[in-house]
Swiss-Prot record:
It catalyses: Couples ATP hydrolysis with the unwinding of duplex DNA at the replication fork by translocating in the 5'-3' direction. This creates two antiparallel DNA single strands (ssDNA). The leading ssDNA polymer is the template for DNA polymerase III holoenzyme which synthesizes a continuous strand; ATP + H2O = ADP + phosphate + H(+). Belongs to the helicase family. DinG subfamily. Type 1 sub-subfamily. [4Fe-4S] cluster binds at C120, C194, C199, C205. Residues 17-294 form the Helicase ATP-binding domain. ATP binds at A54, P55, T56, G57, V58, G59, K60, T61. DNA-dependent ATPase and 5'-3' DNA helicase. Unwinds D-loops, R-loops, forked DNA and G-quadruplex DNA. It comes from the Bacteria. SMART domains: DEXDc, DEXDc2, HELICc2. PROSITE patterns: HELICASE_ATP_BIND_2 (PS51193), HELICASE_CTER (PS51194). This is ATP-dependent DNA helicase DinG.
Length: 716
């Protein structure tokens, strides 16, 4: 479709009307360029897909929404805007689209959040109820849904009242009532525990109400994980050919795709035996009480028992072999170099893939049959079986995918990382097997790039080391296929608005010198706090361990520090805003996640402290396998993996400072390697152009470190 004169006029008119809605609107050349580039791509005038880096201040959200809505209307398609996190998704849904509705009154839009963000009305009713009959019913359905105390029951009753009177839409993030994680776990549900159309509350369920709204909406705000799942199952979203897709925070897409394709499952022998026994009993109950018209051969008891016995013996053999690779009787991990399994293990995985897929198919067949049963049956008993079969289906789906992936030598032209872990839980050792592909470009090509005609990939940061090459390698986007890559200029004058400070540290932030380095950092930070020059500050760390050691050095300043983990992030930010508004000093302290999506302007943030260059962890099975693979191709892992990742992280961290034309301040980076190592100049060259200062550092006094046993974490 060509961009007609009428379409161009419509986009221009909306853009002009928008300027009147936003106080102190500043017209920006990069924004006009982005609107034009997005329009040309979505209309099919230029290229296949567009990757466009739009630095902070460009106004990228409105720059893709205006042309996106205009072209979607012209072509009678649905515009899907996908983000990487709930916060940005909610901002677009609750702020940006309502703003556009003022100039496009008939605009229809909705948001599609993951199932786990919505309340389950069945669970809410049970937790809000004071009637024992409700609890008895749910106990029969195998659900543990009882309020812990009267206060919790009253809270749930208030939530139910808000839901019933349409004061609340059922989203966790859209209520002021405090809901802790334990309560929300019981209030929400997952695919395996949802009765779907068989549920009494189906028509009023917030999750399914939203899913129905998608069919009528012109704009759907989703997230990357949901989009990937929808493209895989061809559900939730309209047909790919009838979509215009914008992937905001597009730099997260390869990681989200990899996470979606990562498979892990418990394979502990007693646990597996129990699951198989439960499934055979479940099938027997279905055959006895809700016998299907056509009996699948595998449901015949003798055949099913033999099938499960073979599966059990294979799992037992797998346990025996894997345990040989790990020290006995303790937590351990073993990774297979280059993802290559010994022939004996490979044969077991291939057979497991076939056997678990057959059980998955059987569970799906019974579930479909149970879902079609009429009201002439015992509805409570039927619902209990549906829930149990749904959970069995979920288990066998994961197992089938896991063993299929384990059987592959490569995925997207790269090895599949494969490893086993032994973990202790409640005094018992459990064995797990994990698989994840290093590259996901083939999957993205199949699900997105080849399926949807035109896609916009955008973010404030898409490049690392001034290059799109890392994005291209990880995503599979390429100029040869007609994809375009555009980097817009920043509208800010960084040279005048701020500066980079690299203190003259005595120590590099290596593991050997970590304690001395953090002591120096704490001394310089204390000096900055005592200067009282800055109200709002942010301190970013590459690891939780380093953050905790830093806090040990500044215990006397703890009251002004708002530390990640103390409270939910949005509450920390709210408190930070209130403090600064009252003229108090406030310091946010966090990890890399605080370097993204944190929009604090002016005095709210005028000094950013960065602990060190954030290279990716080198102990992750995925990173190690990728390094082995790159070396086998005579490529240098530091250049391909570590440095681009570090550059990307540093750009995001530094980007917290200048968020508007009125912002000012300093970025303090406690890492002299930026000036002493050859790669340091390349990292600095990829940052906005700031003047650089190198002040002296007061001597840090090293504290004695208390010996503490660090908790074991699962590595990926």
């Amino acid at each position: 479709m060509a961009l007609t004169a009428a379409l161009k006029a419509q986009i221009a008119a909306w853009y002009k009307a928008l300027q009147e809605q936003i106080p102190d609107f500043i017209p920006r050349a990069p924004q006009r360029q982005m609107i034009a580039d997005v329009a040309k791509t979505l209309a099919g005038e230029e290229g296949r897909h567009l990757a466009i880096e739009a630095p902070t201040g460009v106004g990228k959200t409105l720059s893709y929404l205006i042309p996106g809505i205009a072209i979607a209307r012209e072509e009678q398609k649905t515009l899907v805007v996908s983000t990487a996190n709930v916060a940005l998704q909610d901002q677009i849904y609750s702020k940006d689209l309502p703003l556009l509705k003022k100039i496009i009154p008939d605009l229809k839009f909705t948001a599609a959040f993951g199932r786990g963000r919505y309340v389950c009305p069945r669970n809410l009713t049970a937790l809000a109820s004071t009637e024992p009959t409700q609890q008895d019913l749910l106990a029969f359905l195998d659900d543990e849904l009882t309020p812990n105390n009267q206060e919790e029951q009253k809270r749930c009753a208030k939530l139910k009242g808000d839901l019933d009177t349409y004061k609340w839409d059922g989203l966790r993030d859209h209520t002021d009532i405090a809901i802790d994680d334990d309560l929300w776990r019981r209030l929400s549900t997952d695919k395996a525990s949802c009765l779907n159309r068989n549920c009494y509350y189906y028509r009023e369920c917030p999750f399914f109400v939203t899913r129905r709204e998608i069919q009528e909406a012109e704009v759907v705000v989703a997230n990357h994980a949901l989009v990937m799942a929808a493209m895989e199952s061809e559900a939730v979203l309209p047909d790919p050919k009838n979509l215009l897709l914008v992937l905001d925070e597009g730099h997260h897409l390869p990681d989200v795709a990899r996470d979606a394709l990562e498979m892990s499952a418990e394979i502990t022998v007693p646990w597996y035996r129990l699951q198989l026994d439960l499934f055979t009993k479940l099938v027997a109950t279905c055959m006895e009480q809700f016998r299907p018209k056509t009996i699948p051969p595998l449901a015949i008891p003798e055949r099913l028992n033999a099938h499960c016995e073979e599966l059990y013996e294979l799992i037992a053999s797998l346990n025996n072999i894997l345990n040989l690779y790990m020290p006995a009787g303790q937590e351990a991990e073993h990774r297979f170099a280059m993802g290559e399994l010994p022939d004996e293990l490979l044969e077991i995985c291939q057979r497991l893939a076939k056997l678990t897929e057959m059980l998955r198919g059987l569970a799906e067949l019974f579930l479909n049959d149970l879902s079609e049963k009429t009201g002439s049956h015992d509805i409570v008993r039927l619902h209990r079986l549906i829930l149990q079969m749904n959970r069995a289906l979920g288990m066998f789906e994961v197992q089938s995918k896991l063993w299929r992936l384990a059987s592959l030598a490569q995925s997207s032209g790269a090895p599949v990382t494969k490893w086993a872990t032994r973990e202790e839980r409640e005094g018992q050792l459990h064995l797990w097997f994990h698989c994840v592909g290093i590259r996901v470009s083939d999957q993205l090509e199949r699900l997105l790039w080849r399926s949807i005609p035109h896609i916009i990939v955008t973010s404030a940061t898409l490049r690392s080391l001034n290059s799109f090459s890392r994005l291209q390698e990880m995503s599979g986007l390429k100029e040869k296929a007609g994809d375009r890559f555009v980097a817009l200029d920043s509208p800010f004058n960084h040279c005048e608005q701020g500066k980079i400070v690299i203190p003259r540290m005595r120590f590099e932030p290596s593991i050997d010198n970590e304690e001395q380095h953090i002591a120096e950092m704490a001394a310089f930070f204390r000096e900055q706090v005592e200067s009282k020059k800055y109200l709002g500050m942010l301190v970013l760390f590459a690891s939780g361990r380093a953050m905790q050691r830093f806090l040990d050095y500044v215990t006397d300043l703890r009251l002004m520090l708002l530390v990640q983990g103390d409270q939910p992030r949005y509450r920390l930010v709210e408190l930070h805003r209130k403090r600064v508004a009252n003229g108090e000093r406030s310091v946010l302290v966090g990890l890399q996640s605080f370097a993204e999506g944190l929009d604090l302007k002016g005095d709210l943030l005028s000094q950013v402290h960065i602990h060190k260059i954030a290279f990716p962890p080198i102990d992750s099975p995925v990173v190690i396998t990728e390094g082995e693979w790159l070396k086998s191709l005579n490529r240098y892992p530091f250049e391909v993996q570590s440095l681009p990742s570090a550059s990307f992280n540093l750009i995001q961290q530094v980007g917290r400072l200048i968020r508007s034309h009125g912002c000012w301040g300093e970025v303090v980076i406690y890492d002299k390697r930026l000036l002493t190592k050859n790669y340091g100049k390349r990292l600095l060259d990829a940052l906005p152009v700031f003047p650089i200062e190198q002040p002296e550092v007061p001597e840090g006094i090293v504290k004695k470190k208390e010996k503490t046993k660090s908790p074991r974490r699962r590595r990926r």
